[in-house]
Amino acid sequence: MERRTFLKLAALVPGLALAGCGGSKTLLSPKDPTMLSIWHVYGEQADSPMNRLLTEFNDTVGREKGILLNVTNMTNSAAIGGQLQDAKAGKPGALDLPDLFSAHPSDASALGIETLVNWNDWFTAEDMAAYVPGFVQDGIIEGRQVVFPVSKSTQLIFLNGSQYARFAADTGAQLSTLATWDGFFEMAAAYRQWSQGKPFCALDYPLRLVELNALEQGSGELYKDCWYDLTNEVFRASWMEFARGLVQGDILVSDLYSNTQVMTGETLAGLGSSAAILYYNDFVTYPDNTTEPTDLLLAPLPHAAGTTTPLMPQAGVGLCAFQTTDQKAEAAAVFLRWFTEQQRNLEFAADTGYMPVSSAAFDAIADYPFEQQSYQRLYDVYNEMRIQNTPLSEPGIVGYHAKAKALYDSLRQLQKDYPQRLADGETLEALAEETWQLLCDNA
């Protein structure tokens, strides 16, 4: 109750947090440590790279300055927005609101940017110039830096290399075919035929792929009234291309994260966040309990054939803090400086599969001694995409993620029945049209 009352007060008194980047006197004291609760999305296991860094901070800089960070929720980027809203509303069973938390810009907007720390009060323009400009810009809402960049991701294709080797040997398939969506769907159909009905690829964020394909074909503005412009014919055509693949069983909507389907042999490939590499195991375990090395392969995101404007999605949460006290805001700023220091930011990115946000760290990737070959492959693909493509941020639409989740949940249910419905005589176009109507119903 006290926390929600303070947040209301902070909204009414924007000057409650004093500018800290120019102040010389600290509010922190090792004799009376400032406690910060934190929610994050970097691995839900206790020994995640983020948790190891938090322990290191508490034992070093935190102890020296009087800051103690305590993880009170480890979750994922798809769920954290709803969990924050439940906590803010005080719903039964909800956790207490954290001081510091991972969030998409749309999550920050939904919470109310007036309740959040403006990091520009604690970091100078010179400080922020050390970070990749596009990543910084992502976190600015209505002129306030409310989301601080700590890591970014894109999307790419992960493949079970052992299974792919057999498929390629029998069919002559080549990874270069995946450079375009035409080639992607051609390979998907060939794999379904070769595997006697198995889908080729599980997609984590189909809507984002449809968007990018449409934009590369000159669709123009896609959004209207907090959803999509359903009169945009290029967007509709892009959706229908993916819908036909879904109905035929060439692709499917993943069970939240596609690594699960790849690791169990349900699909040959998964298309999702580059940071998913953290969850790919060294061995694939098939339904009959046989195993074989994953030998993980990676391929860049496909593009529309002939596009002159290749795009790469730029995603990932940053860190936000609720406005409570200047002491807590200063403590959070101290942690962020430490966390995003060049070498540490590079090592964290290398451990988790994210792109670093420090410009110097990004430039140093090429010389980083990766322990696993799959991570070296990942950053090779990152560099290839970075050179050839234009980054594009996620749509910052309040309520977008909830609508997308509802659509994906519906498609997961429908995709189970599509093979039988096709066999029973329903047409491919009619079933693909059914998926379009689902998207329209979410408006």
Q: What are the residue ranges of the model-derived segments?
A:
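Conserved N-terminal structural module of periplasmic/extracytoplasmic solute-binding proteins
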Residues: 2, 7-107, 422, 426, ...
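Extracytoplasmic "Venus flytrap"/periplasmic binding protein-like
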Residues: 63-134, 166-170, 268-269, 287-290
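Hinge/lid segment of periplasmic solute-binding proteins
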Residues: 102-156, 182-185, 293-302
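Short, solvent-exposed loop/beta-turn-alpha elements that line the ligand-binding surface or hinge
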Residues: 120-131, 174-177, 219-238, 244, ...
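Extracytoplasmic/periplasmic solute-binding protein
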Residues: 142-150, 155, 182-228
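Glycine-centered hinge/linker elements that transmit conformational signals in sensory
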Residues: 185-189, 225-256, 297, 301
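Extracytoplasmic/periplasmic substrate-recognition and gating elements
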Residues: 287-356, 360
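Conserved C-terminal helix/tail region of periplasmic/extracytoplasmic solute-binding proteins
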Residues: 359-366, 370-373, 383-443
